[in-house]
Amino acid sequence: MRLILLGPPGAGKGTQATFITQTYGIPQISTGDMLRAAVKAGTPLGIEAKKVMDAGGLMPDEIIIGLVKDRLAQPDCANGYLFDGYPRTIPQADALKDAGVKLDYVIEIAVPDEDIVKRMSGRWVHLASGRSYNTQSNPPKVAGQDDITGEALIQRDDDREETVRHRLGIYQQQTRPLVDYYSSWAAQDPANAPKYRKISGVGSVEEIKARAAAALQS
């Protein structure tokens, strides 16, 4: 099983990625993890990547695709892999295609923007314990207070509504075009393209898991 998960921030990709990798016994391939591992190991690509990171630059696609190819050659990828947060742009998708990286499925988890805003901006945390709450799905017993200690809850900057809307805007500009890229490729060249499946990310975790499982059987 070789696949890409697509969807906006807050769509629940992480939860479904864990479910799929455990179900199929495949690794989750994260470009961030690959970069850190290559830099730590001092590989030729890692040395190049470190220079870019130290200069505060954007990582060139050639370095990323080189890391991807190295990672996919490792034994744990023999039965498949799940890409986490990659590709993010059309040039990255083209690089993956040109490198001959095999894919069976591209799964899009679709959630309306307003649902994402409610879901993410409703998150509040108790810093000392790490306990988290959501005003929509898991509210504290007393608004703004931790259930155990009664101490104040805080909202992380990443979860503020304006930040969430900004991240959704970046997703719509950069990553959303991948939905069209993979769906049109699947329609035009079904023999070679990965199967494109769209599932709703609205509902309980178990409902979405069932949709993901069904999509990977279809």
Swiss-Prot record:
Q: List the residue ranges of the region (LID).
A: 122-159
Family matches, as Pfam families: ADK (PF00406), ADK_lid (PF05191)
Q: What is its main location?
A: cytoplasm
Q: In which pathway does it act?
A: Purine metabolism; AMP biosynthesis via salvage pathway; AMP from ADP: step 1/1
Catalysis performed (reactions): AMP + ATP = 2 ADP
- Which PROSITE patterns does this entry report, sorted A to Z? ADENYLATE_KINASE
Q: What is its EC number?
A: 2.7.4.3
Q: Where in the cell is it found?
A: Cytoplasm
Name the UniProt record assigns to this protein:
Adenylate kinase
Write down the species.
Bordetella avium (strain 197N)
